[in-house]
Amino acid sequence: LGALVVTTTAAKGAIPETHPLSAGATLELEPTQRVLAAADIVLAVGSELAETSFWTSAASIRLGDQLIRVDIDPAQLVRSFRPDLAILGDAALTMAALTERLAGTPVTGAEERAARLWAENRAEHEVPETMNRCRMLNMLAEYLPENCFISLDSTQVAYTGASYFRIDHPNGWHFPNGFGTLGTGVPTAIGAKLGAPERPAMVIAGDG
């Protein structure tokens, strides 16, 4: 579609965050929320748009002049945010149909907006209170092998990394931000290795 893409933390890496149209899993950050509020249309695909994705109440969030939601579950189509248009269907099939229908429609400026938004959001983290976490995450990005599965406990590095660290492959970041469950990092990584033994795995553990 040629549009700027933002994901929830649960979908982190579903769209490679190194893609020029990606603005990462940054829904909780103020620069992204400004962009969403100013958008003509927000297309939400397969997302419950939960308060845990925004880290604030739904009442304080504005999702564009018009909101279109795509979901295979009728209940999810109206959860948290009531859309202007609800499309009940499989996400992959619906997006393929939309892409075909909109082929040739000129879209300009999205890559520049995504790059600018990445820079603004990273600046939100690169402040004295969180700079040490950013340094650690930048070192990990330099040395981690490709296609690595990262399993995280509910820890400050995870909170920062969810919107700061870039993942360029699906199922590469598992962080229990829904319930904030403690102690899931190691068992989740074990399960990931059992399911995909060819993939390297790393755990970031700790409380607080």
Protein language model annotation of sequence segments:
Residues 1, 115-198:
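Active-site diphosphate/adenylate-binding microenvironment
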Residues 198-208:
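DG-centered beta-turn motif at the end of beta-strands
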Residues 41, 149, 200-202:
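Structural motif
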Residues 1-68, 168-198:
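Glycine-rich, anion-gripping cofactor-binding loops and their flanking helix/strand elements
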Residues 44-46, 71, 153, 204-205:
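Short beta-strand segments
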Residues 54-58, 80-82, 99-100, 162-165:
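Short amphipathic alpha-helical segments
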Residues 11-16, 50-51, 74-78, 84, ...:
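Short gly/pro/ser/thr-enriched loop/turn and capping motifs at secondary-structure boundaries
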Residues 64-154:
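Phosphate/pyrophosphate-binding active-site segments
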